[in-house]
C-alpha cells in the first residue's frame, strides 16, 4: 500500500467523520427547534392577561397562574438567601483556608456525589425531615430548605472552581504587599472569580425554576393566592408543580402548555443572563 492510497483513505475517512458530526449536530438542533416550536405553538395562544394575573377558582370557574408565579419567586428568594452565604462561604474556606487536604477531597467527593442524586429523593427526605419532623408544614419554607440542600453542592463546586482559576501569583503578590489573608481573599481572589461565581448562582436559579419532583413533597399543590409570610407555611404550588396538576389531574392541556412556554422563556432568560453577566464581569 503506497502513500497515495493512504492519503486517499485518510481524506475519505476525515470527510466521512465530518459528515457524521454535522449530521449529529443537525439532528440535535432540529430536535431542539421542533421541541421549542411545538411548545410555543401550543402555549402562546393561551397566554392571556387573565391567565397571568388571575387565580384558579372552582366557584367562579376561572383559571389563573399568578399564585404559581409568586410562589416560584418566593421559593427562589428563600433558597438563594440561605444557600448563597453557605455555598460561597464554604467554598472560600475549603479553597483558601482549609489545611487538611484529605478532608477537602472528601467534602468535594461528597458534593459531587450529591449532585448526581435524583431530586425526588431530596423531596422525600425534605418531606420526612422539614415537613414532618420539624413540623414546618408543606409550603414555601419547607420547599426552599429542601432546595437549599439540593443546590448547595452545585454552588459549592462552581464557586470552588472559579476560585481555583485565580493564579497563585495574585495571592502571593497581595500577601507580599502586606495585605492580610481575608483582605487578600476579598479584594484579589473574589474580585477575579466573581464572574464564575455569579454565573453559577444564576444557573442555580434556573435549576430552582425548573424543579418539580422535590417540591411535590415539600411545597404542596396549593393554587391559592397568598402573601409571602402566609405562603411560608401554606401549600404553595410553583409553576412546575402547577404544570403537573393541570396536565395530569385536571386535564387542562392548554394551560399546561402555556405554563411550559413561560418556563421555557424563563430558562432562556436565565441562561442568557448568566452568559451576559459572566462576560461583562470578566471584562471588568
What are these regions (language model features)?
Residues 112-148:
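Generic hydrophobic transmembrane alpha-helix motif, especially the helices
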Residues 80, 158-159, 181-219:
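Transmembrane alpha-helices
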Residues 30, 72, 76, 80-92, ...:
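Hydrophobic positions within alpha-helical transmembrane segments of bacterial inner-membrane proteins
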Residues 118, 177-178, 191:
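Glycine/proline-centered hinge or cleavage motifs at structural transition points of membrane proteins
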Residues 86-126, 154-161, 284:
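Cytoplasmic-entry segments and transmembrane alpha-helices of multi-pass inner-membrane transporters
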Residues 16, 160, 164, 202, ...:
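C-terminal transmembrane helix and the adjacent membrane-cytosol boundary/short C-terminal tail
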Residues 56-63, 215-264:
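Interhelical loop and adjacent transmembrane-helix boundary motif
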Residues 3-23, 37-79, 100, 245-254:
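Periplasmic/extracellular loop-to-transmembrane helix junction in inner-membrane transport proteins
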